[in-house]
UniProtKB/Swiss-Prot annotation:
Function: Uptake of L-rhamnose across the cytoplasmic membrane with the concomitant transport of protons into the cell (symport system).
UniProt lineage: Bacteria, Pseudomonadati, Pseudomonadota, Gammaproteobacteria, Enterobacterales
Reactions that this protein is recorded to catalyse: L-rhamnopyranose(in) + H(+)(in) = L-rhamnopyranose(out) + H(+)(out)
Pfam families: RhaT (PF06379)
Protein name stated in the entry: L-rhamnose-proton symporter
Membrane topology listed for this record: Multi-pass membrane protein
Location of the protein in the cell: Cell inner membrane
Cellular component GO terms, alphabetical: plasma membrane
Keyword Cell membrane: yes
Sequence intervals crossing the membrane: 4-24, 38-58, 68-88, 101-121, 131-151, 175-195, 214-234, 259-279, 290-310, 323-343
Length: 345
């Protein structure tokens, strides 16, 4: 396995670790509605950071974006909005199915859809099946899906042992939302593929290969921001017991703490895709679809490890922890299979 591929996998792991940890600061926010907290973090992660980073990278910020036609930018924006819809559905999926089943189904579907639809739509799937390296990477995708399923089973055992139930369990509604969440969340993978002309233009301007995807985030995350912030603002305006005015009328020390914690959560959220861009840059072009598989499977892996480190599994018993450990090992094996496949001609 080449150093470039190894580093690509490592950067995806670091990005996924940030994704697994980003909600920790949000949990410390007090006396704010979820909508206000999510909006403040979202403004940082979807608007401020993509714009600031792009302004630092590009020699002429406005000229870069003006150089693209609407036919190039619109699909990138719409796929970003598609991913934003998946974000909203994610929370509802957890509500009706519970954390473990919801995450397992949603992540499993988005892993498959986001990974395999791109080569299918681009007419490259036959090439992948017809080469030794392609077949090995596809095997790695399947093994990763098995790993996600095992971790999901561990979560179910944990919830059963600890008496944790879904807020409003509804299997039919939850499954529909999980499928929608999985499909729409794959919009980020599609957006990255649609943004290739933007990446190439950034490279032509002399932007380092590690950073060429970052300017496209202004458009991708702009689409996601429209959906997420729109959802939050509508709820803040229409739901009687929600009030952004009340949330910002707290005592100054608590208000500052809430803003900083939400901003930190937003920063950590952004970093997952900052390092995703680095990892994506190191993956061979013919296997760029694998970036999404690595990100999502590592997200599940890191989520399990973080849960163990935070002692969330302390009272779950030995069997759930053993099953979780097995699932994590399977995901690590999947990453190695994919890495070997990418290194095979």
């Amino acid at each position: 396995m080449s150093n470039a591929i190894t580093m690509g996998i490592l950067w995806h792991l670091i990005g996924a670790a940030s994704a697994a940890c980003f909600y920790a600061p949000f949990k410390k926010v007090r006396h704010w509605s979820w909508e206000t907290m999510w909006s403040v973090g979202g403004v940082v992660s979807w608007l401020i950071l993509p714009w600031v980073v792009s302004a630092l990278l590009l020699p002429d910020f406005w000229a870069y974006y003006r150089s693209f036609s609407a036919a190039t930018l619109l699909p990138v924006f719409l796929f970003g909005a598609m991913w934003g819809i998946g974000n909203i559905n994610y929370g509802l999926t957890m509500r009706y199915l519970g954390m473990s089943m919801g995450i397992g189904i949603a992540i499993g579907i988005t892993l498959i859809v986001g990974t395999l639809m791109t080569p299918l739509l681009n007419g490259k799937f036959g090439v992948l099946v017809g080469t030794a390296g392609g077949r090995m990477t596809l095997l790695g995708v399947f093994v990763a899906l098995v790993g996600v399923a095992i971790v999901t089973r561990a979560g179910q055992l944990k919830e059963r042992q600890m008496g944790i139930k879904a807020e409003e369990f509804n299997l039919k509604k939850g499954l529909v939302l999980a499928v929608l969440c999985g499909v729409f969340s794959a919009g980020m993978s599609f957006a990255m593929d649609a943004a290739k002309p933007m990446h190439e233009a950034a490279a032509a301007l002399g932007v380092d290969p590690l950073y060429v995807a970052l300017p496209s985030y202004v458009v991708i995350m702009g689409g996601g921001a429209l959906i997420n912030l729109g959802f939050c603002f509508i709820r803040l305006a229409k739901v009687k017991n929600l009030s952004i005015k009340a949330d910002f009328s707290l005592a100054k020390p608590l208000l500052i703490s809430n803003v900083l914690l939400s901003a930190l959560g937003g920063l950590m959220w952004y970093l997952q895709f900052f390092f995703y861009a680095w990892g994506h840059a190191r993956i061979p072009a013919q296997y760029d679809y694998i970036s999404w598989m690595l990100h999502m499977s590592f997200y599940v892996l890191c989520g399990g490890i973080v849960g163990l480190l935070l002692r969330e599994w302390k009272t779950a018993g030995r069997r759930p922890v053993s099953v979780l450990s097995l699932g994590c090992v399977v995901i690590i094996v999947a990453a190695n299979i994919v890495g070997l496949g990418m290194a095979t001609n």
